[in-house]
Amino acid sequence: MLTICTQVPSEFQTQVPSFANPPTLTMAVTDFIARLKARTSTPSDADLGMDAGIQAVFSDAPAGIPGNQHLESPELAMAYLKSIYGPLKRHYDWFRRTQRGQIKQYARTARSRTEAYRWRGRSQMHVLTSGMDDYPRGPPHAGELHLDLISWMGYFTKTMKDIAGFVGETEDEASFIEIEKAIVQNLDGN
C-alpha cells in the first residue's frame, strides 16, 4: 500500500510542536458567521408578507437543504460556535505565543511591540510551515519577520473577534479588537 509518507522526503515529515501552518480553517468559520449574519439581517418572505401563495406550491419541498441546519437554526449555530470557541481560542493563543517575532531586540520601530510574527521551522531553502515552501526568500535570520504570517494573524484575530462578538464574549471581543488594530497599524506602518 502506497502511503503519503513514502512520497514526502523524511526531513519534511517531522512534526515540531512550535511549528505552525497558516490557520486556513478559520476562513470557513469567518464565512459561516458571514452567512449567519446575512440570514438574520435579511427579512424573510413571511416578514415581507410575500409568502401567502408560495407555501402551497412548494409544500412537498424538503424543509431544508441537508447540511444547512446550522444556518437555518440560530440555536444550533450558537451552540456550534460556543463549542468551537474555547479550542479555537487556545489554538489562537498558542499561535501568538509560538510564532511571535522580535521587534525591540532588533531596534525596530513599530506601533505595537508585540504584534509581529515569523514562521518557525525555517531552513536555508524551505519555509514549509508557511504553506509556500517554494516561495523565494532570502537567507534566514533570527530576527526576520514574515508579512504573510502577520497578515494571517490579522485574519485569525478578526475571526476570533467575530466569534467572540457572536457568542457574547464581550471582554474577549474587546481584546481582539485591540490586537487586530495593533496588527493593522504594524502592517500599515502607522
Task: Label the model's feature ranges.
Residues 1-30, 34, 41, 145-147:
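Substrate-binding groove/exosite segments of carbohydrate-active enzymes
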Residues 12-20, 75, 79, 137-151, ...:
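Alpha-helix capping and helix-loop boundary segments enriched in small/acidic/polar residues
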Residues 96-113, 151-190:
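Catalytic cores of carbohydrate-active enzymes
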Residues 1, 13, 27, 91-99, ...:
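Tryptophan-centric aromatic hotspots in well-structured domains and transmembrane helices
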Residues 32-39, 170, 190:
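Secondary-structure transition/capping motifs at alpha-helix termini
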Residues 23, 27-30, 86-89, 147, ...:
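A structural signal for well-ordered alpha-helical segments within the folded catalytic domains
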Residues 36-147:
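Active-site acid/base region of carbohydrate-active enzymes
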